[in-house]
């Protein structure tokens, strides 16, 4: 029920890979505690519901809810919605996207963090089927008007402003704000045409490591070291010494994806191994390979020499 990108056999996956069957595909971005997700899955058992949520606590609560209710047509992803849209949905296969009460980022200097911007609508058009739609429900009029303008700027959608469906007002926060007498806004953004710019998925790699000759250094002074990468940034947070070498807790940020993973430097039968630990099922991307490359550079500065490079 929980989608872990690194464990998927096919990349990007097909609907059959995720759900074990075909059916109308719906993506909910920001499902919170999952009560709307569960209601949707119950009311439309023929639909296949993929949810994306950044809060780990919310994902856990929603996962428990789905299991408790035995909802086999739901899959949950812990991470950002645009990542799921880009990498877990094939082009032209998505029937609907649902966004209920997104973070409005009300301050002007934060508006670039809003989800429903022109670039998102353009990319969304590559994943929606012809006639597919995005449904937005919000209590923030400024955000609502902003989203309408951003979608209109693309020329790719027909926008229909409608009363919000009752089911969309039964989320955790909607119920709270309904009692407070707030006004709600709802619109359907229906795809008319597709943006010509391709939006390929992230490239996933099987390995990211190097073998080096030489002796392990006595220490690695890497704590809280940030490294700029072509694809983002890596931060070496902590270094722990073990019997065989070092473990480096590393934070990697790239577009729509943040990972905390372990890199390891240890003795092996063929020399010194430096690479990604499989602990936690990290997704090996260009940025992760860049983090390993930065670690290897530090080892080279200690006098080790690369004899095999898969970074």
UniProtKB/Swiss-Prot annotation:
Record keywords, A-Z: Methyltransferase, S-adenosyl-L-methionine, Transferase, tRNA processing
Binding site for substrate: 107, 139
Active site (record annotation): 103
Gene Ontology molecular function terms on file: tRNA (guanine(46)-N7)-methyltransferase activity
InterPro entries linked: SAM-dependent_MTases_sf, tRNA_(Gua-N-7)_MeTrfase_Trmb, tRNA_methyltr_TrmB_bact
One CC-aspect GO term: tRNA methyltransferase complex
The keyword Transferase is assigned to this record: yes
Pathway(s) per entry: tRNA modification; N(7)-methylguanine-tRNA biosynthesis
PROSITE patterns in the record: SAM_MT_TRMB
SUPFAM superfamilies documented for this protein: S-adenosyl-L-methionine-dependent methyltransferases
Record Pfam families: Methyltransf_4 (PF02390)
Binding site for S-adenosyl-L-methionine: 28, 53, 103
Catalytic activities: guanosine(46) in tRNA + S-adenosyl-L-methionine = N(7)-methylguanosine(46) in tRNA + S-adenosyl-L-homocysteine
Coiled coil residues, start to end: none
Function recorded in the entry: Catalyzes the formation of N(7)-methylguanine at position 46 (m7G46) in tRNA.
Family: Belongs to the class I-like SAM-binding methyltransferase superfamily. TrmB family.
Name of the featured protein: tRNA (guanine-N(7)-)-methyltransferase
Taxonomic source organism: Thermus thermophilus (strain ATCC BAA-163 / DSM 7039 / HB27)
Gene name linked to the record: trmB
